[in-house]
Structure formats: structure tokens, C-alpha cells
From Swiss-Prot:
Function: One of the essential components for the initiation of protein synthesis. Protects formylmethionyl-tRNA from spontaneous hydrolysis and promotes its binding to the 30S ribosomal subunits. Also involved in the hydrolysis of GTP during the formation of the 70S ribosomal complex.
Keyword Plastid part of the UniProt annotation: yes
Biological source species: Arabidopsis thaliana
Transit peptide: 1-63
Region (G5): 648-650
Residues covered by region (Disordered): 158-208, 230-284, 300-393
Biased composition (Polar residues): 178-194
Keywords associated with the record: Chloroplast, GTP-binding, Initiation factor, Nucleotide-binding, Plastid, Protein biosynthesis, Transit peptide
Residue ranges constituting the tr-type G domain according to the UniProt record: 499-672
Protein name: Translation initiation factor IF-2, chloroplastic
């Protein structure tokens, strides 16, 4: 870049040729350095020849404070700037060039120095024309006119500028005290820099010719020029200057002559004059005042890119004496307050207001002024500082209260309550009250609900009545719903269906001959080996039946007939294709017969009636058929659609006809399944074997189950290690409709769960864990005897006059059974027992033999261990004996139910029963040494000493006590019979009146039954008016 004389125009420095009052800096070479600034008074241009070269001469006269300097510059053909004459003297004044008068202003606010930036061309830069510097023709008069015209134009525009108040960061930059440069002695104008160090003359502040402008102070200033502004095609870069310094580096070997050093007074910095940009400043956007608590928008700092700085438009001239009150911008009157954060901040006080005012005295207010287009301009700028206002404690509390109010439960108007009642927690939630309110209600009624979690339906109704909530009885899921048969076909299976064996379930009342019929079909003796002669589990068997001379496979399920095994019958009906209902010809339809028929109808399976025991005396098949027709099962012989076959299972009479009928019905159903897919089915039974571990009996409904498959059923999963058929033989696979026992599960599944084959153990584990989470709460609530409070319990407290507590007994039970289905059966049988005074609590219900851990649990909780179809080893029995734990093992469910009943009745308190033994009438009263004595005539029975007597006066009992003294003719006797007179005395009563009736009785303690206790509770409820 060729050297040239660069004229930069800013107010308190050497004026350029374009703007008077600017600064003139001599720049040599390609590097820029600091320059000396002063006020230009005269500028003249001429061309002269020096030593045979054509050069341009620039003569200017500068006035700085009281010093006037005249310097000559020449520019050679290479545009190198060289000084050929320089004079500096103090107190020089010309007639026309009077000293500049400046206005006095306060000291500007200092700002820390900013990093030095490469200096570029100024706003009003007037570079030398390249053509002229290379020796072109120059018309001095024409150029002089152009300069004068441009200077006048600048003066006119400067007088019209609006000057914002000083100190505002928006109006200009703070200045920095000038410091003499280390290399100022080498610079061409070094004398001016040195004058600030050695000058002692007092600076005079006078009125400025600019009328408006910054004050003049002999302090160092840091002047940051405006950001990039395009003016006359020249782009300026932001830079920092230190006033009073000139660092001009010569671009040629020729060194300029230096004037002799003379001390000078301090240089007066002049107000800056920035050239007015060609593009008009944008209209001020309406500010958005944010809350004081919000983070203030950071000002553009040195780290921010210069492209961001260029978006800020700052005034050119700054007047320190301008009014601090800004003019009202019309756009600012339409400012919109931004929404604040939720919650009310802490109230402001005087101290905070004063502190805020002091802190922001020289800065902008704490309220952010956000332009409407900030979102577009500053979208990519990362702003430092706080993210937002910290909420006060009151704000956080208000938000928490509002959130709690929104999440508060809503009072229900109608509440459905199931038969087993409702927990206290659920009731409190539905009534939108606290659990303490319900507990307080129970205490007010004389109930101490310690450890109580569930209220029965009647108690819930009574509580809801006080809160004006209607209660509806919600029926629990009936067993018929469990028996509903599910669809086993998928669309992808329709093209691969094959015939499958029918699944036939034998159902009916207990002891009607179901297992005997199956024994004849299987040619086995299962019934003889059953405990008590009754079936207590589902038996699945595969049998080959001869049909038309060919053997066809059938699967028979033998279900229990006892009332306690309703769930088992429902599961049997759910997987069956045909239901055989066995009815004894000598007994007719019984309760379990009706239940089995209901299960079959719910499962929508065909029904075949087998009227059994026709060879027995008193058998009446016609009566049975008539009873069946009365409940909707019309025999085919009578024009109906229900096949009925009269058989004798014991002798095998007509059993073949029954099988032929069953196979005909199965053929009409066209039973098919897809064996070429992963197996799916249902668990009909499950248990824990001491040698095999957890096992389960599956009925495959579709697909083929193979050894090695990964199976998941409910919360149990595992890899199939072994498969056993109904006879105990190992098999490798099981197709549709085939029952099979599976070994390899991690725990005992729940009977009735569906199983399916998955790809890996990880998938099976995830599915089992998800299922376990959903079943955990159901299992907890399903435990019987978890402390239920009933109206009978309330009546017990009322009748016993025990208002301080609840007279409630509890029997803790640990139940161990052989298979999962037996748990359901035992619990259903025990739930039938009245539990108004004694409740049952099952601490543990599991499959497997009795173990030492069961004994430890029973010892800690004072429970009884009941085992059903399980065993207890000798070591376990010995440990139980040492710890005082009772173990009861049963093979028949009848015996278990009877013993549990006896245990519950043993916890009931005995009642006192008064047995009358005699009656007497008071004929006279007399006094004796021991008090008043009643002379009586024994009308009936006898009176015995120390027996109980009751004094009845006018039909009302006035006293009940013990006969303490009995005399006959002044002699103490033990007994007085009817028809004799005697004297009767009591230690605690002597208010005898003639005509009183005295009744004698004996008090005996009598044990109550559960039914008697329940009746007494009902009477207490009525008496209490609850």
C-alpha cells in the first residue's frame, strides 16, 4: 500500500481537510500508529519541485491551547509523506486566527482501556487522490473551493445535531486520560505529547465554537469510535485512541527533521466530531420493559463481534450539560410490559430502592430495553449473566400451594363399593378428605382402628352418608366371567389350520361320579387313590377313544366338584370344547350342578348331560330330565337340543354311547388349530415340587410347545427343561389341545394365566417384571384378613360398653398347599365362615412343603401352620415343637375347614348364661345384727346359698347380686326348698319391700359358635340404632 497523507476527522484532534476541528495524522507505510491531535486553523496546498522531483506541499497551521504550529508536508511521487518545515512556539497568535473558545464541562466518566485495534480510515477520511500524487495536473483554486464547500457543509449539519445526555452509554463512549507515548520523541509531533507532561499552565475552559459538545479536560481519554459506518464508500473499523500520542513510522529511509524540544502545557482534548453517516439512523423501536428481577441484557462488550456492534447507532456529539431527562419517544409510549414469572416477589423497601439507584447511577436502568427485532439479530449470541430471577420464598410457596390445589382430589358424588369393602386410603381420596378424618370418625364411634386398612361395605356406606355421597354396590368379577372362552385363531393361522383333538371337561356336583366315569374311560383307578374320595385338583388326561373302529385322541379334564373349587371349574370350562355335566339319578340337580352349567354356558361350549347311577336304588332319570328342562336344558328325546345319556359309570353301562355322542358333537364343531407356530395356551394348574422345583400344567391351544423354548406366563418365566405327559413320560413336544407338565420356570405361576413363547430370556424377563409390578398391589389387597372393620365390630364395642377400644379377635394363618389352585379353594371355603368377631389373616400362602422358615414366621407372629396335601419333615416338626408352633396337615378340605372353625370359636369370649333354679316372694322385712333381712316364701324350685338372685319389683329388675345369708328359723342353712319360709340377706342390698319377687339362678360360662356371635352382633346393631 503506498504511503499517503491520511486525514482523519474527530472532534478533539487535528482537523482533516474535510471536517474542520478533526484530527490530522501522518501515516507512513502500511502500519498505523498513534498521532498528535490539535485544532487546524489554516490549510494550503501547492505543488513545488524539490531536488528535481515533483512533490505536493501541504501547509497547515495548528492551534493547541496557546501554541500555534506551522508545518509543511510534501508528498513525493511515491506518496511518501515528509515534513520539510516545522515551527513550534508558545503564545503565537494571528490576527484572524484567534484562539478557539471552548465550553467548560464536568469530567467525563472513565472507562477501562480497551484492547488496541488496528486503525483504519476514519469516518471523514479524505485520502489524497492517486492521480494527483503521481504528478497529474492540479488546479489549486478548484481544490481549495471544494474543501471550503465541504467544511461549511459539515458545520451546518453539526449545529443541527441532537445531543443526548452525557454519561449515557448509548450516547457515546467514555474517554481515557491521555498518556505520553514511549516513542513520542521519535514522532513528528512529539512536542505536543511532551507538552502534556511538562506543562504547568492552568488550563482555561472557554466557550467552544461548536456550541454543543463534550467538555475539554486535561485527562487521558479512551475514545472508541462508532462501529462500522459506510460513508462515501469508505468503511471504518472500531478503534481506540490515546489522545496526545503520535507514533508515525517512516515509510522511507529519509527521516524528517525534528524541531528542538520545548516544554508545552497540557493538551486540551477537544470534543469528538463524527461524520454523519449517509444512511439515516433507524427509527427507535418501542422498548419492552422487563421485570427488575429479570437478568439485565448485557451491553455489547469487547468480546462481541464487530458485526454485532455495527447494529448499535450512537449519537455523534455528546453534551455533558444536556438535560438528564430524555425526550419522550413517541414509539416508547407504546411500550409493552413483558409477562413476569409466576409468584409474587418480595416487597421492595427504601434500602433496596436506594441501593439500586446508587448502583445504576451511571448505567442504564435495571429494566431491560429489548428491541422488537432482538430475536432476529441476537439469536445466535450467547449472553452471559443470570438466566433469570431467583424466586423468593413467598413465590415458591405460592406456586407449591397452587400446584397442590390443582392436584387435590375431587369429591365423588357417587361411589361404587365392592363386596369386600374399601381401603381407608381410597375412601379418603374419593371423599376428598384426609385419612385422619376417617380415623377420627371411627374413634368417635368407639373403634380403635389400629392396624386397620380396610372398611367393609356397610361401614363405608355409613361414612359416606355423613358426607352426602351416594354408594352403589359394585359386583365383583363373577366366576362365570373367568370361564369365558377366548378366541384362539389369528388371521395368519387360517391357511395353516389342521384338525386337533377335542378338549372335554367333566363337571358336576361332588360325589356324582365324575372321576369314576373318567376311570372307566381311562381304564384306571384314580378315584380309589383320591383322599376322602373327592377330587381336589384338575386332572388332565389324553385318552384314545374308539370311533367307528378307529382310535381318536381326546383330552379329558377332571375338575373338582366341591363348592370351594369354583375357580378351578371356571378354568376348566374356559379351555374346553365340550362339557359333560354329570348328574346323579338319585340326587338330582345340586348347587354345584347349577354352577357347572353356568360355567359351560358362559364359555359358550356345547353341553352333554350324563345321568349317572341309574343302577342305584331310588334312581329317577325322568325326574332329573324334568329338572334340567326347567332350567333351560331340554333333552333331545323331548324335542330339545341337549344330548342326554343315561349311564352307570361304575359298571360301564352306556359309556360307549356317551363317547360316541361326544365325538359326534366334536366333529360338528370342526375343531382346528395351527401347529406350525410358537405355542400359546393357558396354565390350568401350577405348584412346587420338592425334587423338580416349580412346575405347571399347560394346555396348548395353538402352536407346538417344544423342549428348549423360552416361555413366559404371568410373572414366571424360564426355559423349558423337560416336558411330561399325563402318565409322567418325557416328551419332546406338545401340539394343540395336548396337556403337558412343564419344568424349568423360575417360580410358580398363577393358575389361569396365559403362556406364550418368546425369542429370548431377556425378553421374557422384561415381560415378567412388567407383569409382576401390576400384580404386586393386587396380591397385597387380595390377602384375607388384613384388618377389616365392620359394622358388627362396631356393634361389638357398643354391646360390650367398651367405648375405649374395639373387641376384635384375629387368627393368623400360614397356608402351604400342593398346587396353586388349592390356595383359591381353601380361601374361598374359609371366607364363608362368619368373621364378625374373629377375622382371618393369611400371613403366607404358598405352594410346597412346610419348611423351617414357615415355622420361624409362625413363631414370630403367633400363627398356626395349615398344610393341605403337603408334608413336613421330622426336623421341621421338631423345630416347631421346640418353638411352640402348631402344624396341622390335611388331605381333605372338609377337615381343614372344621378345624379352622374350631380355632376361630376358641378365640371368642365365653358368655355367661343364667339358669333359673327358684323363685320366692317377700312377705315381711325385719332387722338383724347384719342388717335388714327379707322374710320370704319359696314358691317354686329352691334357694341355695351363694347362688345368684335377682330382685324384681313391679316387673323391673332393681338389683342383681349374690345370696350371702340364708336362714331357716334363725339357723343358717345351705338350701331351702319350695313351700318353706326363709330369711334372705345380701351384703350390698337391704332395700326390701313387701311384694318383691326374688329369682334365684346359677351363672354358667358357655362357649359361643360363630353363628351365635354373628346373631349377637346383629342384635347389638339394632339395639344401638346404628
Amino acid at each position: 500500500m503506498p504511503s499517503m497523507l491520511v486525514l482523519v476527522g474527530t472532534m478533539p484532534s487535528l482537523a482533516s481537510l474535510v471536517s474542520l476541528g478533526g484530527a490530522c495524522a501522518s501515516v507512513s507505510g502500511t502500519s498505523s500508529s498513534d498521532a498528535s491531535y490539535a485544532l487546524v486553523k489554516r490549510v494550503s496546498l501547492s505543488r513545488r519541485s524539490v531536488k528535481g522531483t515533483k512533490k505536493w506541499l501541504c501547509r497547515y497551521s495548528v492551534s493547541s491551547s496557546t501554541t500555534t504550529t506551522t508545518a509543511d508536508f510534501i508528498a513525493d511521487q511515491n506518496n511518501n509523506s515528509v515534513s520539510i518545515d516545522s515551527n513550534s512556539f508558545r503564545g503565537s497568535k494571528d490576527g484572524d486566527d484567534s484562539e478557539v473558545v471552548l465550553k467548560q464541562t464536568p469530567k467525563p466518566v472513565l472507562k477501562p482501556p480497551v484492547a488496541r485495534v488496528e486503525r483504519g480510515l476514519g469516518v471523514n477520511t479524505a485520502p489524497w487522490s492517486k492521480d494527483l500524487s503521481n504528478g497529474g495536473k492540479f488546479d489549486g483554486e478548484e481544490e481549495r473551493n471544494k474543501v471550503i464547500e465541504s467544511l461549511g457543509e459539515v458545520l451546518d449539519k453539526a449545529e443541527k445535531l441532537e445531543i443526548p445526555k452525557p454519561g449515557n452509554k448509548e450516547g457515546g463512549e467514555a474517554v481515557k486520560p491521555s498518556q505520553p507515548s514511549a516513542n513520542s520523541s521519535n514522532s513528528r509531533n512529539g512536542s505536543y505529547a511532551n507538552a502534556s507532561d511538562g506543562g504547568t499552565r492552568k488550563t482555561k475552559t472557554m466557550k467552544s465554537v461548536w456550541r454543543k459538545g463534550d467538555a475539554v479536560a486535561a485527562v487521558q481519554k479512551v475514545v472508541k469510535e462508532s462501529p462500522k459506518i459506510f460513508n462515501r464508500g469508505v468503511q471504518t473499523e472500531p478503534r481506540t485512541r490515546e489522545e496526545g500520542e503520535v507514533n508515525a513510522k517512516a515509510g522511507t529511509p529519509l527521516a524528517p527533521p525534528q524541531p528542538p524540544f520545548r516544554p508545552q502545557p497540557p493538551v486540551r482534548p477537544q470534543p469528538m466530531l463524527q461524520g454523519k453517516p449517509m444512511v439515516a439512523p433507524p427509527v427507535k423501536k418501542s422498548p419492552i420493559l422487563k421485570d427488575l428481577g429479570m437478568a439485565a441484557k448485557p451491553l455489547v462488550s469487547e468480546e462481541v463481534d464487530s458485526s454485532v456492534k455495527s447494529k448499535e447507532r450512537k449519537p455523534i456529539l455528546v453534551d455533558k450539560f444536556a438535560s438528564k431527562k430524555k425526550g419522550v419517544d413517541p414509539a416508547a409510549s407504546q411500550a409493552v410490559l413483558a409477562p413476569t414469572k409466576p409468584g409474587k416477589g418480595p416487597p421492595s423497601n427504601k434500602f433496596r430502592v436506594e441501593h439500586r439507584n446508587k448502583k445504576n447511577a451511571s448505567a442504564s436502568p435495571r429494566r431491560r430495553i429489548v428491541a422488537e427485532d432482538d430475536g432476529d439479530d441476537d439469536a445466535s449470541i450467547s449472553r452471559s449473566g443470570r438466566k433469570g430471577r431467583k424466586w423468593s420464598k413467598a413465590s415458591r410457596k405460592a406456586v407449591r400451594l397452587q400446584a397442590a390445589k390443582d392436584a387435590a382430589p375431587v369429591k365423588a358424588e357417587i361411589l361404587e363399593v365392592e363386596e369386600e369393602g374399601m381401603s381407608i386410603e381410597d375412601l379418603a381420596y374419593n371423599l376428598a378428605i384426609g385419612e385422619g378424618d376417617i380415623l377420627g370418625y371411627l374413634y368417635s364411634k368407639g373403634i380403635r382402628p389400629d392396624g386397620v386398612h380396610t372398611l367393609d361395605r356397610e361401614m363405608v356406606k355409613m361414612i359416606c352418608r355423613d358426607y352426602d355421597v351416594e354408594v352403589l354396590d359394585a359386583d365383583s368379577v363373577k366366576v362365570e366371567e373367568m370361564a369365558k372362552k377366548r378366541q384362539t385363531f389369528d388371521e395368519e393361522d387360517l391357511d395353516k389350520l389342521e384338525d386337533r383333538p377335542p378338549v372335554i371337561t367333566i363337571m358336576g356336583h361332588v360325589d356324582h361320579g365324575k372321576t369314576t366315569l373318567l376311570d372307566y374311560i381311562r381304564k384306571s383307578k384314580v378315584a380309589a387313590s383320591e383322599a376322602g374320595g373327592i377330587t381336589q385338583g384338575i386332572g388332565a388326561y389324553k385318552v384314545s377313544v374308539p370311533v367307528d373302529g378307529k382310535l381318536q385322541s381326546c383330552v379329558f379334564l377332571d375338575t373338582p366338584g366341591h363348592e370351594a373349587f369354583g375357580a378351578m371349574r371356571a378354568r376348566g370350562a374356559r379351555v374346553t370344547d365340550i362339557a359333560i355335566i354329570v348328574v346323579a339319578a338319585d340326587d338330582g340337580i345340586r348347587p354345584q350342578t347349577n354352577e357347572a352349567i353356568a360355567h359351560a354356558k358362559a364359555a359358550a361350549v356345547p353341553i352333554v348331560i350324563a345321568i349317572n347311577k341309574i343302577d342305584k336304588e331310588g334312581a329317577s332319570p325322568d325326574r332329573v330330565m324334568q329338572e334340567l328342562s326347567s332350567i333351560g336344558l331340554m333333552p333331545e328325546d323331548w324335542g330339545g337340543d341337549v344330548p342326554m345319556v343315561q349311564i352307570s359309570a361304575l359298571k360301564g353301562e352306556n359309556v360307549d354311547d356317551l363317547l360316541e355322542t361326544v365325538m359326534l358333537v366334536a366333529e360338528l364343531q370342526e375343531l382346528k388349530a395351527n401347529p406350525h407356530r410358537n405355542a400359546k395356551g393357558i396354565v390350568i394348574e401350577a405348584g412346587l415340587d420338592k425334587a423338580k422345583g416349580p412346575f405347571a400344567t399347560f394346555i396348548v391351544q395353538k402352536g407346538t410347545l417344544k423342549r428348549g423354548d423360552v416361555v413366559v406366563c404371568g410373572e414366571a418365566f424360564g426355559k423349558v427343561r423337560a416336558l411330561f405327559d399325563h402318565s409322567g413320560e418325557r416328551v419332546d413336544e406338545a401340539g394343540p389341545s395336548i396337556p403337558v407338565q412343564v419344568i424349568g420356570l423360575n417360580n410358580v405361576p398363577i393358575a389361569g394365566d396365559e403362556f406364550e413363547i418368546v425369542s429370548s430370556l431377556d425378553v421374557a424377563r422384561e415381560m415378567a417384571e412388567a407383569r409382576a409390578v401390576s400384580l404386586r398391589d393386587e396380591r397385597i389387597s387380595a390377602k384375607a384378613g388384613d384388618g377389616k372393620v365392620t359394622l358388627s365390630s362396631l356393634a361389638s364395642a357398643v354391646s360390650a360398653k367398651k367405648m375405649s377400644g374395639l373387641d376384635l379377635h384375629q387368627l393368623n394363618i400360614i397356608l402351604k398347599v400342593d398346587v396353586q389352585g388349592s390356595i383359591e379353594a381353601v380361601r374361598q371355603a374359609l371366607q364363608v365362615l362368619p368373621q364378625e368377631n374373629v377375622t382371618l389373616k393369611f400371613l403366607l400362602q404358598a405352594t410346597g412343603d412346610v419348611s423351617n422358615s414357615d415355622v420361624d414366621l409362625a413363631s414370630a407372629s403367633e400363627a398356626i401352620v395349615f398344610g393341605f396335601n403337603v408334608k413336613a419333615s421330622g426336623s421341621v416338626k421338631k423345630a416347631a415343637e421346640n418353638k411352640g408352633v402348631e402344624i396341622r396337615l390335611y388331605r381333605v378340605i372338609y377337615e381343614l375347614i372344621d378345624d379352622v372353625r374350631n380355632a376361630m370359636e376358641g378365640l371368642l369370649e365365653s358368655v355367661e348364661e343364667q339358669i333359673p333354679i327358684g323363685s320366692a316372694e317377700v312377705r315381711a322385712t325385719f332387722s338383724s345384727g347384719s342388717g335388714r333381712v327379707a322374710g320370704c316364701m319359696v314358691n317354686e324350685g329352691k334357694f341355695v346359698k351363694d347362688c345368684g338372685i335377682r330382685v324384681v319389683r313391679k316387673g323391673k329388675t332393681v338389683h342383681v347380686g349374690v345370696l350371702d345369708s340364708l336362714k331357716r328359723v334363725k339357723e343358717n342353712v345351705k338350701e331351702v326348698s319350695a313351700g318353706l319360709e326363709c330369711g334372705i340377706g345380701m351384703d350390698d342390698y337391704d332395700d326390701w319391700i313387701e311384694g318383691d319377687i326374688i329369682e334365684a339362678f346359677n351363672a354358667v360360662q358357655k362357649r359361643r359358635t360363630l353363628e351365635e356371635a354373628s346373631a349377637s352382633m346383629s342384635a347389638a346393631i339394632e339395639e344401638a340404632g346404628v
